[in-house]
């Protein structure tokens, strides 16, 4: 049942080409206004709906497809396990993705969803492929505090945006600290969170205002996919009766093995009431932020306390956030109901005094299964261009290869409507090149085929092992499908095939 995402671009009209909208997103005139950027994204989904949507809109199709992607991040040569040590003796496990060079790049902190840890995360694999493999960013993927690994490795336990938001600030400080060797590879820091991990992204966007140095933002941008906005009501919706709640309860028991050793009251619980009792016990025994220290500045009038629910309802303090916060939310969402969460921001039911917060509402998808009902290439382009637009110090350089097509075989073939379709062939384990199979079509519908070989040494990764692993082979295909541009180039009455791709400068 598993499948390997390739991220293949499909031919779209010029008006709906992801490349066109990506360049618009990176326009410096828009980067200063999140409302304009958000309006542009919403407009893209509305005006290009027929080309962006794949037709895979079924509820179970979306869930099954997101859960069955074939990917082995734990054995990926470019990903390594790390442990981040935080105040309060908190240990946070992560996967660090580095391109293998010494270039300063934007680094994206990815916060996983409920119960997810770096040894076992499924739907979030798509975002790791998009942000690390297909984009010019380095990535630090961090477990959710509700994961079994976090329970096993820490004496205290909690969950939610208050604690994870503080963690995000502390991790961003580490990544920006000149004493830390990793900081030498960091151009700017960005945070990207999913579901319950999105709640911490939202709180850290508020904390960022009070914890950034005078010379610039600590964190440059925030992205939240189907985030929890109202933690208490979302938890009630997950645990209050029905088949869904019974399934979630069984799932939580399986994923939180060992929690009863940290919360003795969980030794006994009523049928299908494990999660609700766990949540109640966490709130009852909460003593304040697990990693809260006085150097983390909270908003005025907000104090660290033992009131779990009050601390996680931080919206009354949410004023004039300075860095952009872009939320993607799907109307269909059984896990984080849209009407209880992102819709509160969109409809202004939450009185938020900030122009740097914007919701993109999407009609297709189930709990942000965006790469299933929408074009993978386009989604990646939107994520990539948003982060790039808020990384002003990061520059890219375009690599170009021209192939002369003036010989007899191509005589009279080309016209103003000529275009190129391509398919990337997976390179062999010992190859230093990758083959691109192309079909060139002119305006009359005639087609010709040709192949092109490109050297791996010219891409945005440094391949140091004598043989490519399966993960690297698949990554190369995805990277080229996202970044390779091919076109027929007229020059002095002749024609050439021009291949271009961009890499970090």
Question: What residue spans do the PLM features occupy?
Answer:
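Short beta-to-alpha linker loops that shape the active-site pocket of alpha/beta-hydrolase fold enzymes
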Residues: 143-148, 228, 365
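Glycine-rich "HGGG/HGxG" loop immediately N-terminal to the catalytic nucleophile
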Residues: 146-158
